[in-house]
Amino acid sequence: MLSHLIGILFNPSEEWKKIRDVECTIGKCYCGYVFIMAAIAPVCGYFGTTMFGWEIGAREAVKLSSDSALIIAIAYYFVMLVGVFSMGAMIHWMGKTYNSEQNLSRSVRLAAFTATPLFLVGFVELFPILWLNFVLGLPALAYSVKLLYTGVPIMMEIDEDRGFLFSSSILAVGMVALIVMLVATAILWFNGFAPQFVD
């Protein structure tokens, strides 16, 4: 599945057709792509926050303890794995509304490859500088949205108009999920689950 990485970034329309035509179970998709790609941000984030620390403005860098960073990295990885499957399941469920009867495996592939730019921008977490993550994160998010709108009509085998509406619905669900995650993180942070910092 990693063989589709370059194509999905530089020639998405053609690559989506190849991804659509690949017979791939959810397990194979995860083993060949999601498990690897989803590990980039947690691993880089672990080393970035323990070795260099977060830099916010002109303040001194803030490092996390190894134990605290490890717990966050594992939780981060788990959330990403669950997130890809959840989005795939939601795409599969919503597909009937748009006259798309594709299987769950194809929906999960759509979710996984749409997230490719977001997976790759995880390398920036090796250098946890707030403005740098923000500046590079926004284009990655924008390109993921482009991949979504390009991929839905091809993967779900529906016309462009329904594909646009379907993509917009998926995007709305994704934004709601992101807000829920941020709120949950804030609640945990202020209820005794804040990370441990070191000097």
Predicted regions and their residues:
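Juxtamembrane, membrane-proximal amphipathic segments and lipid-exposed surfaces
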Residues: 38, 42-45, 109, 153-154, ...
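Generic preference for flexible, low-structure residues
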Residues: 21, 32, 46-47, 51, ...
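Membrane-helix interface segments in multi-pass membrane proteins
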Residues: 44-79, 125-140, 180-199
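Alpha-helical transmembrane segments
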Residues: 5, 83-87, 141, 145, ...
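Hydrophobic alpha-helical transmembrane segments and adjacent short intramembrane/lumenal linkers
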Residues: 91-92, 98-173, 178-179
